[in-house]
């Protein structure tokens, strides 16, 4: 519970669905979303280019693509609601944009959990300048 409180305090002031996404990541992986995923590999965090470094980084690449398929939505600003049912993330009833953003975040959080065994601390604070290749297509 203390970890949830610390993450919530760290995320105060973060706009939109980033708060919900961070909570999903914490709940699914047990990892602090800010320190474990914000700078991971070539795609986790702001922007992205090159080839994903591993399965976790690919989760971020796919998440970026998912957001890219929402041109009429504001994924980093629009808030949504979700809950858990039998341990699974269930996106709440909201607007079409809110639901699609939630589904993108849900898929990424589940992807992170499924790839916890291959999470590589070498990529935790990976420098952007090492991500040189042209980005893959979504």
From Swiss-Prot:
The active site is at 63, 105. Residues 1-16 form the signal peptide. Disulfide bonds join 42-131, 44-60, 59-111, 65-138, 66-104, 73-97, 91-102. GO terms for molecular function: acetylcholine receptor inhibitor activity; calcium ion binding; calcium-dependent phospholipase A2 activity; phospholipid binding; toxin activity. Its main location: secreted. One of its GO terms (biological process) is lipid catabolic process. Its EC number is 3.1.1.4. It is found in: Secreted. Transmembrane segments: none annotated. SMART domains: PA2c. Coiled coil: none annotated. Binds 1 Ca(2+) ion. Its cofactor is Ca(2+). Ca(2+) binds at residues 43, 45, 47, 64. Keywords: Acetylcholine receptor inhibiting toxin, Blood coagulation cascade inhibiting toxin, Disulfide bond, Hemostasis impairing toxin, Hydrolase, Lipid degradation, Lipid metabolism, Metal-binding, Neurotoxin, Postsynaptic neurotoxin, Secreted, Signal, Toxin. The keyword Hydrolase applies. Snake venom phospholipase A2 that may have a strong anticoagulant activity. Is able to suppress the acetylcholine (ACh)-evoked current mediated by alpha-7 (CHRNA7)-similar nAChRs in L.stagnalis neurons (IC(50)=10.5 uM) and to compete with alpha-bungarotoxin for binding to muscle- and alpha-7 neuronal nAChR types, as well as to AChBPs. Belongs to the phospholipase A2 family. Group II subfamily. D49 sub-subfamily. PANTHER family: PHOSPHOLIPASE A2 FAMILY MEMBER (PTHR11716), PHOSPHOLIPASE A2, MEMBRANE ASSOCIATED (PTHR11716:SF9). This is Basic phospholipase A2 vurtoxin. It comes from Vipera renardi.
